Amino acid sequence: MSHQLFRNTRIYSPMDSGQPSAGKAQGKLAHFPNGALLVADGLIVAMGDEEAVLAVAKGGAEVEEVDCGGRCMIPGFVDPHTHMCFAAPREAEFAQRIAGTSYLQILSEGGGILSSVRAVALAGEDELYKSTLHRVQTALSFGTTSLEIKSGYGLDTDNELKMLRVIGRVAVDSCLDIVATFLGAHAIPGQYKTDADAFITMIVEEMLPRVREQGIARFCDVFCERGVFSIEQSRILLKAARAMGLGLKIHADEVTDLGGAGLAAELGACSADHLLAASDTNIRAMSQAGVIATLLPATAYSLRKDYARARVMIENRVAVALATDCNPGSSFTESMQFVIGLAVLNMEMTPAEALTGASLNSAYALNMADRVGSLDRGKQADFLLLEGETPAVLAYHAGVSSVASVYKRGEKVH
């Protein structure tokens, strides 16, 4: 078995203790200023000081050496919350929002998510596949090596299944590890505008069984927000999804403190996402339940809202993950580097905390930490080489990509 030895590199990585990094642990990185990484069959065999890794390499088979040129090495980014499967951008609504129209007002008038629903219904499956694959490849160029993609622009059984099929095709054809999430309860379609309860019943009785039969989605999500789906409606849907074997996620407390974070804690969801308006009480409940907070600072940036209180969450030992929320309405970016910069500059996270949030904790938010998210022995050799002395360059050097190279399972892919 041949080995690859990546040497002459400064390594920075969170280390996996078997659980998400919370509290002070989120800010701790392993650092090897004269580091090396030994890879076999796409998996990490050894990582650490170059001399120690060389000793391991000499005891094995033939070794191919790769000189990293003194560059900084970090884990590949894991993006645990995206809506990359969509048919058309929404630039006109961007102009409306800049002029002062609120996101929820646009939605109530049939725009927003409902505009994307109409576009997906009109799009052919191949067209949707090509545009989604392009966005995934763009994310890869910025250093993302694993990500999640949600459905949610279908809102009927046929189009939700179409979106999941597209996500499944992209997962096969892309080199990234891609996780699909079913988000049938993303908005209330027109025919159910006055009866959201009936729509939830339809999802539970018709959509969910078909989603389970299709076998592509690994999680179920719901937009739990005033004017969309209530706490009780969200509870009914998520409990049904859990009974069908799906992991749970919640769009929680993005606009108002409805209590979605508390519901995530009650149900033992894998993550609660957004959380701009989450209360101290529900943040503590998330901590006690081990729910990961997936924060989306690019959305707050785009909507010109206050940012989620990452510092409060970290101080309460909630593991914080970071994601792009890439979507055509409120966060059109594929760049985890941009997200890290916003987290450091606007959410008071340290560069080390942000890197952990964009890698290890994000992997836990997708139940993927057994194979990605850190440079631990036995995990996939998914890593980045940076143009900079430390990971702080990701926030410090704004407006450019600091990623020199992207490796997936030990192979250079960008």
Curated annotation (Swiss-Prot):
Q: In which pathway does it act?
A: Amino-acid degradation; L-histidine degradation into L-glutamate; N-formimidoyl-L-glutamate from L-histidine: step 3/3
- What UniProt keywords are attached to this protein's entry? Cytoplasm, Histidine metabolism, Hydrolase, Iron, Metal-binding, Zinc
Binding annotation for Zn(2+): 81, 83, 251, 325
Q: In its keyword annotation, does this UniProt entry include Hydrolase? A: yes
Q: What is its EC number?
A: 3.5.2.7
User: Biased composition, Polar residues: where in the chain?
Assistant: 1-20
One GO term describing the cellular component: cytoplasm
Localization annotation: Cytoplasm
Record-annotated residues binding 4-imidazolone-5-propanoate? 90, 153, 186, 254, 330
Q: Which GO terms describe its biological process?
A: L-histidine catabolic process to glutamate and formamide; L-histidine catabolic process to glutamate and formate
What is the predominant subcellular site recorded for this chain? cytoplasm
State the source organism's domain of life: Bacteria
Q: InterPro entries attached here?
A: Amidohydro-rel (IPR006680), HutI (IPR005920), Metal-dep_hydrolase_composite (IPR011059), Metal_Hydrolase (IPR032466)
Which cofactors is this protein said to need? Zn(2+); Fe(3+)
Which EC class heads this enzyme's classification? Answer: hydrolase
Q: How is the cofactor bound?
A: Binds 1 zinc or iron ion per subunit.
Cite the binding residues for Fe(3+). 81, 83, 251, 325
Stretch list, region Disordered = 1-26
- MF terms in GO: imidazolonepropionase activity; iron ion binding; zinc ion binding
State where N-formimidoyl-L-glutamate binds.
153, 327, 329
Listed under catalytic activity are: 4-imidazolone-5-propanoate + H2O = N-formimidoyl-L-glutamate
- Gene3D superfamilies associated with the record: Metal-dependent hydrolases (3.20.20.140), Urease, subunit C, domain 1 (2.30.40.10)
Summary of the function given for this chain in its UniProt record: Catalyzes the hydrolytic cleavage of the carbon-nitrogen bond in imidazolone-5-propanoate to yield N-formimidoyl-L-glutamate. It is the third step in the universal histidine degradation pathway.
This one is known as Imidazolonepropionase
Q: Which organism is it from?
A: Desulfotalea psychrophila (strain LSv54 / DSM 12343)
Species lineage: Bacteria, Pseudomonadati, Thermodesulfobacteriota, Desulfobulbia, Desulfobulbales
